[in-house]
Design a protein with these regions (language model features):
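Extracellular glycan-modifying ectodomains
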Residues: 1-333
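Extended, solvent-exposed regions of the mature portions of secreted/cell-surface glycoproteins
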Residues: 334-423
Length: 423
């Protein structure tokens, strides 16, 4: 449960121009409109995003989770970021289809993400070799990797997972960890007493029909897994590890629940979305990024490939541009500006005046706050850009103006201090 919010914070939150869905008399097709019913008419939805930390160019990053994590990974690589989850070590892994090489590390549920991190980071944890399945003809199946990986001998199967563990171990060097949550439907191996990364392949079920059972996991189970992941990264990871959690917008390929796949997918994504929110609320170094909402609230014709499962490159590019704009300090995609003119304010009779100008590159949720001599910040203005006069500048006082991506005051996008000359 999140902490109570003070009335002062509520006032700042309500000043957020993106806090309202509709207002009487507002024009629905106003392209720079801040109301939800205006922004939702754009082909690509742009939500108000409040970054909880700043990503630095020299930071190392690691992406783990569902296949959507791979799209995020490549976008960061194109920005010349140091993404340690990228590797050439998987180039020798043979696939049975056109699965991307990095796809061999896809982790589709919170159980498999935790398992892989535990085996890689905790010296006391050992990979359960008894979960490897003898399919026959000298071939073995590893249910903790991607099912697109071709079967191999026991020795080769173990060797492959050792490579995956060695790559996953790099996460300990990374200040920024991006975790993408994918599925709530999970399979369990009763013999090895462990949850799997994906549904067991047909040959495994055919050879061992009573070995596996299907689970529709709940909120408590998934939150518990994320808490255990947080403990692992806190104990074995970077001293200032920052975790960005997202929910993959890619829907279920199929459901084993007996429900309509659309209903099953809605349950899965809703559960993971609320789990992510609860996890982020519990830890200052866990931050939710709304890639799921961006996709779901964009134009369907722009968003999806023909299968209505995979997101188009255009949307992934939009998502990553928003991520970099808000999180990456010094990014060319973050042209936030805040200025005061004149500054310092000339001496004179009465209170002085200065004009505060700001620009947030189209961020409709941008808010300018002002604090006098370190007092509680107060709302000054809002909007993606603009100019407002501050006509109450006193000599001997310092006014700190800050441009924020919404009511969050912890990570201002730009600052300017204003003073007035004395006689």
């Amino acid at each position: 449960m999140s902490n109570p919010i003070t009335t002062a914070e509520v006032g700042r939150n309500f000043a957020n121009p993106c806090s309202r869905w509709h207002e009487k008399g507002a024009l629905p097709y106003q392209t720079d409109g801040k109301l939800a019913f205006q922004r939702l008419r754009q082909p690509l939805f742009t939500p108000a995003i409040r970054p909880g930390f700043r990503l630095r160019r020299e930071d190392k990053l690691f992406a783990i989770g569902s296949c959507f994590a791979r799209g995020i990974e490549w976008a960061l690589i194109e920005q010349k970021m140091d993404v340690l989850s990228k590797t050439t070590k998987f180039d020798s892994f043979p696939a049975i289809n056109d699965e991307a090489r990095l796809g061999f590390t896809n982790k589709y549920n919170t159980f498999s993400i935790y398992n892989e991190l535990c085996w890689a980071l905790d010296p006391a944890a050992k990979f359960p070799r008894k979960s490897l399945v003898d399919i026959g003809d000298g071939l073995f199946y590893d249910p903790h990797t991607n099912p697109a990986l071709q079967l191999a001998s026991l020795e080769e199967t173990i060797h492959r997972h050792q490579i995956i563990e060695s790559v996953t171990r790099r996460i300990a060097q990374c200040r920024v960890v991006i975790i993408t949550l994918g599925l709530a439907e999970v399979w369990r191996d009763k013999v090895a007493n462990i949850f799997l990364n994906h549904a067991p392949i047909r040959d495994a079920v055919r050879s061992h029909p009573d070995r596996y059972e299907f689970h529709i996991t709940n909120f408590a189970q998934n939150l518990s897994n994320l808490e255990r992941i947080h403990t692992l990264l806190s104990q074995f990871g970077h001293a200032d590890v920052q975790i960005v959690v997202t929910v993959s917008p890619v829907p279920l390929r199929a459901t084993f629940s007996g429900e309509d796949v659309v209903l099953a997918n809605t349950y899965s994504k809703s559960l993971l979305r609320t789990v992510a929110q609860e996890w982020a609320a519990a830890h200052k170094n866990v931050h939710y990024f709304p890639s799921y909402e961006i996709v779901q609230n964009s134009d369907r014709l722009v968003t999806w490939e023909e299968d209505l499962r995979h997101v188009t490159g255009k949307v992934t590019e939009h998502i990553m541009k928003l991520f970099l704009r808000h999180y990456l300090a010094g990014s060319p995609d973050t042209p936030y500006k805040l200025s005061a003119s004149p500054n310092p304010v000339p001496a004179g009779v009465g209170r002085g005046k200065t004009t505060i100008s700001w620009s947030s590159d189209g961020d409709a949720a941008a808010v300018v706050y002002v604090s006098k001599d370190g007092a509680e910040p107060a709302f000054f203005a809002s909007g993606s850009h603009g100019s407002e006069e501050a006509g109450w500048i006193e000599a001997g006082a310092t006014y700190e103006f800050s441009l924020n991506g919404g009511p969050n005051l912890n990570t201002p996008l730009a600052r300017v201090s204003v003073t007035r000359l004395k006689h």
